C-alpha cells in the first residue's frame, strides 16, 4: 500500500503544531501493521535483514522473537543483535564476517550473504533483504565500482534463485546525476528563495530525503515539502516557485496527496519536485556538502520514479499487467508461490 495508508512518507517530517522535525524511523509512526507482522500472526516464519538500522525497527514491528519464527537485524548493527530483540545472536561469528563500514559496498553484501545463509539454514516462509543505495549515490552506471557492486549482487541473486522460491527484485527509487558541468551540485535553496520573496513571512522547507547518512547525498533531493506560517500566502508562494525554471512540479498539499497517495497530515502545504539534473535544499547554510567527495547523485523527483521489477517465474508475463508499483512485490511473490 502507498504511504497514504501506512503513514511513512519519507525519512523525515515536520509537525507545525510543535515545531518538531522528526526522523520517521520509529514504529509509532506506522498506521498499519506490516506485511511481515500479518504473516507472522498467521504462523509464518519471517526473516528481515536490512543494511541500515533505521529500517530494522519499522520492519520488525509486531514480530515476536521468543518462538523461533522471526529474525530481524541490520548489517550496520549486526554485532548488537540478541535473541530477545532480533531472534539471532553472534551474527558476525555465524556469518564469519565483521561489522561492515556503513559507507561501503560491504554493508549491502553482508545483507545478501546473510540472506543466502538464512534461506539455507532457517528456511523462512518470507524473507526480505534491503540493501543500501550508497554505491548508486556515488557512482554512475558503468563505473568500475558500480559494476563491481552489481556483479556481487548478481552472484547472490543467483544463489537465492537456485532454491525453489518465488523471488522479486525491485527498488525504492531510481538515481540521477545532479551536478553542473564542473561537477558541483545543482541545488535550489527554496527557503532562501522564499525569504527573499516574502521577507516578513516564515516558510519552512523540509526535505524528506534527510537522514543521518549525509555522505550519500548531503540531504539534497529532488522532492521538498514547504510549510507556510501564513496560510493566505500559499497560492502566492506557489506562483513564485513556478517561476523557477529548475522546479518541474509545484502542487498544493491536496493536489499532491491525491496524485501521489501521500498522508495529508504529514505533508507540507506545498509540494515541489525539481527537474532531472537539479536538487532542492532548504537554506544554503543548512547543507554541509563537504562530505560529498564524488559528484552528487540523488533522487526524489519524477525522473527517479522508474525502477526495475524482476521476477523469477517463467509462467508470468508482468509486462502485460499494466502499471506495477514497487510495493506490489509481495503480491506477485505470493502469487508465484501459490502457483
Regions picked out by a protein language model, each given a short descriptive name:
Residues 1-339:
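Feature captures the catalytic ectodomains and active-site-proximal regions of enzymes
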Amino acid at each position: 500500500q502507498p504511504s497514504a495508508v501506512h503513514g511513512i512518507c519519507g525519512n523525515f517530517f515536520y509537525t507545525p503544531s510543535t515545531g518538531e522535525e522528526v526522523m520517521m524511523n520509529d514504529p509509532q509512526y506506522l498506521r498499519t501493521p506490516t506485511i511481515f507482522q500479518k504473516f507472522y500472526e498467521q504462523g509464518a516464519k519471517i526473516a528481515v535483514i536490512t543494511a541500515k538500522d533505521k529500517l530494522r525497527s519499522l520492519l520488525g514491528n509486531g514480530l515476536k522473537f521468543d518462538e523461533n519464527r522471526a529474525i530481524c537485524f541490520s548489517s550496520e548493527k549486526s554485532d548488537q543483535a540478541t535473541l530477545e530483540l532480533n531472534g539471532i545472536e553472534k551474527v558476525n561469528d555465524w556469518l564469519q564476517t565483521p561489522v561492515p563500514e556503513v559507507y561501503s559496498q560491504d554493508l549491502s553484501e553482508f545483507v545478501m550473504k546473510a540472506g543466502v545463509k538464512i534461506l539455507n539454514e532457517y528456511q523462512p516462509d518470507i524473507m526480505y533483504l534491503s540493501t543500501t543505495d550508497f554505491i548508486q549515490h556515488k557512482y554512475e552506471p558503468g563505473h568500475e565500482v558500480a559494476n563491481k557492486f552489481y556483479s556481487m549482487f548478481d552472484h547472490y541473486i543467483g544463489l537465492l534463485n537456485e532454491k525453489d522460491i518465488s523471488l522479486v527484485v525491485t527498488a525504492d527509487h531510481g538515481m540521477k546525476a545532479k551536478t553542473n558541468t564542473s561537477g558541483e551540485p545543482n541545488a535550489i535553496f527554496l527557503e532562501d528563495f522564499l525569504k527573499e520573496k516574502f521577507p516578513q513571512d516564515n516558510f519552512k522547507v523540509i526535505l524528506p530525503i534527510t537522514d543521518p547518512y549525509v555522505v550519500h547525498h548531503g540531504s539534497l533531493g529532488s522532492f521538498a515539502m514547504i510549510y507556510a506560517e501564513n496560510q493566505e500566502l500559499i497560492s502566492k508562494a506557489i506562483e513564485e516557485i513556478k517561476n523557477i525554471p529548475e522546479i518541474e512540479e509545484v502542487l498544493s498539499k491536496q493536489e499532491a496527496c491525491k496524485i501521489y497517495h501521500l498522508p495529508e497530515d504529514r505533508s507540507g502545504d506545498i509540494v515541489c519536485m525539481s527537474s532531472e539534473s537539479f536538487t532542492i535544499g532548504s537554506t544554503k547554510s543548512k547543507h554541509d556538502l563537504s562530505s560529498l567527495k564524488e559528484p552528487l547523485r540523488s533522487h526524489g523527483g519524477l525522473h527517479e520514479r522508474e525502477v526495475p521489477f524482476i521476477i523469477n517465474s517463467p509462467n508470468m508475463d508482468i509486462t502485460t499487467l499494466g502499471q506495477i508499483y514497487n510495493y506490489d512485490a509481495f503480491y506477485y511473490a505470493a502469487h508465484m508461490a501459490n502457483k
